[in-house]
């Protein structure tokens, strides 16, 4: 069990403590960095700026902020978004960090609108659903009240090591 393997558990969220303590785990909540920098987004304003109606569905694709993430998980997220794009009332957006904007631009389908990082909170709030690489962004999107489908793809060496234990 987890209690046999660790002496003390560092939790990100307060709601984790009541789950772990009854199993004999001492817990300390350290918090999450996204909670300290949360800014409410204005989804209606983003929809107006982009010319979207209130009824159009917005799929927000967030393939990561690091080159390796974008290379590994990006294609799967874009493939899922393209399946959803068959509906005429769907718009696909992405927010690209400045450090990977060129890489994201080269990867996205032509119908995708690429937003500046300064619009991320508004995009998070405007989205009907987000398809996101696992990371801090999933918490940031969830704080805006938007459902998130989280994806992750291991590198082949990590996968091979993990597979040996499963």
Give the residues covered by each predicted segment.
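Nucleotide-activated sugar donor-binding and catalytic core shared by glycosyltransferases
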Residues: 1-166
């Amino acid at each position: 069990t987890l209690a046999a393997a660790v002496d003390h558990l560092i939790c990100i969220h307060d709601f984790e403590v009541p789950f772990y303590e009854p199993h004999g785990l001492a817990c300390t909540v350290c918090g999450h960095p996204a909670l300290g920098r949360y800014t409410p987004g204005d989804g209606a304003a983003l929809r107006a700026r982009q010319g979207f109606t209130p009824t159009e569905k917005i799929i927000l694709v967030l393939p990561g902020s690091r080159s390796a993430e974008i290379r590994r998980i990006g294609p799967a997220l874009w493939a899922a978004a393209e399946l959803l794009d068959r509906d005429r009332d769907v718009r696909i957006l992405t927010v690209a960090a400045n450090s990977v904007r060129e890489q994201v631009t080269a990867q996205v389908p032509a119908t995708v609108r690429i937003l500046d990082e300064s619009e991320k909170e508004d995009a998070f709030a405007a989205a009907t659903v987000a398809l996101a690489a696992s990371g801090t962004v999933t918490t940031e999107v969830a704080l805006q009240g938007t459902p998130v489908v989280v994806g992750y793809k291991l590198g082949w060496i990590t996968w091979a090591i993990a597979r040996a234990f499963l």
